[in-house]
């Protein structure tokens, strides 16, 4: 989940709650503990599952084609990139919206590309989907139009497609700065305060712990992940 989704809010439509059936758990270390011997025996199962998922990807409603009025460009995207595309282009261009990107639907992508003159992959950061499409023998554009650094935006999509960027609106007043800090009452604050006083070199981990690196605690020197 990308930051723009995780740190956002919007109006949603709710449906009736669906209770999945309870499934009994059976202990099976050979299945759930992937020590080398078990991992070798389970690897064929993983490959079989991926093949089944590849078939599922072709028909699942998670991956869908949305028609457009101008087939000169076909856009392939997923996640927030899809929302940027729809807000920037509306229903002008056909869109292949991928809700499942591994395994990717090969036949669906090829059929979509056959119906448009030019295929553009819109995705943030590395060109994962673009590389897959190129591997299928398609002439696609992606990172030649979009940066592999930072976030996308509606205007970034517009500029890449030769459209006029939308005008922005500046705030009349500056928003008060709110630097990241651990929440009041967080028990980690006391720990990091003590580590700071001891002047230790501390290797942290992902999550809220990273906030221990900023002032006034300044207690973490590195993180293992993220």
Residue ranges with predicted function:
Residues 192, 201-226:
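Thiamine diphosphate
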Residues 1-182, 187-191, 196-200:
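Flexible, low-complexity linker and terminal segments
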């Amino acid at each position: 989940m990308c930051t723009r989704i995780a740190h956002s809010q919007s109006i949603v439509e709710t449906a009736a709650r669906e209770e999945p059936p309870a499934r009994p758990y059976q202990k099976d270390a050979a299945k759930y503990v992937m020590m080398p011997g078990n991992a070798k025996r389970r690897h064929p199962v993983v490959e079989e599952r991926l093949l089944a998922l590849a078939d599922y990807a072709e028909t699942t409603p998670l991956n869908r084609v949305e028609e457009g009025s101008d087939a000169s460009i076909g856009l392939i995207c997923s996640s927030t990139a899809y929302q940027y595309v729809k807000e920037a282009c509306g229903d002008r261009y056909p869109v292949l919206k991928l809700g499942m990107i591994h395994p990717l639907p090969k036949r669906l992508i090829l059929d979509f590309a056959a119906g448009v003159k030019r295929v553009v992959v819109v995705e943030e950061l590395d060109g994962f989907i673009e590389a897959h499409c190129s591997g299928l023998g398609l002439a696609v554009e992606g990172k030649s139009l979009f940066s592999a650094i930072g976030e996308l935006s509606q205007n970034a999509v517009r500029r890449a497609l030769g459209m006029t960027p939308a005008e922005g609106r500046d705030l009349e007043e500056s928003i008060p700065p709110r630097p990241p800090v651990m929440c009041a009452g967080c028990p980690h604050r006391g720990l990091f305060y003590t580590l700071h006083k001891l002047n230790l070199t501390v290797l942290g981990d992902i999550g809220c712990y990273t906030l221990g690196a900023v002032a006034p605690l300044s207690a973490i020197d590195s993180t293992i992940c993220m």
